[in-house]
Every structure is written in structure tokens, then in C-alpha cells.
């Protein structure tokens, strides 16, 4: 996939995120799975089929119910197109899960998908220190972050207003330090800074 293709599919994922029913306890996320030849295989968004389903989980489950990347049947054969596919998600895939036995990171790895494109890293709001990015890389997947889409991806989550009580503690409260083995170490991830600016504007604070 080219950078132009990545931008095109991420724009679609952002549109899907806006379809989510807002929740005070979960993010609004959109996801699209695209084959190696550039055709769309599946799409999903948070809470599109039940109140706790995640976007990546939904997209995988629609494409191949019972496949390794789908809940409930980790040993079933997967869709043969998945190893060459890319999954686009507006948020870093979860690495810890309370509502399901397997995280979206685990589902993606099990599905055979080898390329993941995200718009922004998960803030430490519901689960501390999400490691989706790192775990995917450790499993050998190519993981790409598109900071240019961070504000757009955060916008459907403006109802959370998760910065309101943290404002006095500084803008880096929810920006995690990225480990040097994966990226250049930094105290305040620039994409998170853009997200924070967007959410302050959206909430009028």
C-alpha cells in the first residue's frame, strides 16, 4: 500500500468512527480491512453489533466468522486473503480487555494480518499503558502510525472530555513515553499533543 492509499482508507475509518454510539466507558473507533490488491474486505466500528464489540474485532468477525481473528473459535481456518491484508484502525488496538477473553491485538496477530495502520495511540483513560503497538511489532507485524489523522480520529471521542480533570497536571498526562527500541524516546508524543489541542478546542476549555 502507498501512503496515498493509507490516507484514503484511514479517512474511511474515521468516517466509521463517527457512526459509533457514544459511550462514557469506551472509545469510538472505526476499522477497515483491505486486501493486498486494494479491495475492501471488511469494516467495523465500536459497538456496531453489540454494546462491547471493538472496531477491529467487528471487522475481523464479519470477514471470517470462526476464524483465528474472530472471537470464540481460535483454531478455525482463517480467510486466505488476510496474510496479505492491512487493517486500518483509528485507534491503537487494545492490548488488555475486560469485556472479552482476547484483546484486539491478539485477534489481529491470530488472524494472520501482517500490516496495521493506526491514527493515534490509546490514552491511559480506561486501561493504563496500552501496549498494542509494541506487541504487534514484537509479533513481526508492520505497524504504521499516521499522526496527520490524530485530530480527526480523536474528534468522535470528544464526548469523553477526558482532559477536563487533568488540565492542571499538564498536557503530557496521557502521552506515554515511547520505548527507544521502537521509536525515538520522547516525553510528549507529538500526535498526542495534536489530539489534546483538538479536544481542548472541542470542549471549549
Locate predicted features:
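Short, basic/aromatic recognition patches
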Residues: 5-24
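N-terminal nucleotide/polyanion-binding subdomain common to many enzyme families
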Residues: 154-191, 205
